Amino acid sequence: MSEFRYAVNVLPKPGILDPQGRAVELSLPHLNVTSVSRVRVGRRAELTVTADSEAEARQVVEGLAKELLSNPLIEAYAIELLEATSSTDSTKATLA
């Protein structure tokens, strides 16, 4: 068995109202920041999954992202593999 550490990033889908992103965008001029636009605010979850393979671990994370961590009607998610650790030889590979 190996451990796989993932990040799931969730953002409002394009065209969906993003009041937090809008509030940040409206605050930028008060900070003299003029080079930033189209701000989107979301959330990030990090999970460690123990599985026989990366494909099996990703399937678990995909299910959680779709069913628990996001609302597929109004949010999009992206899954990123951060780290993989093999329990057989304690090899650690950081991917980020």
Q: Model regions: which residues?
A:
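Long, contiguous binding/interaction regions
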Residues: 1-96
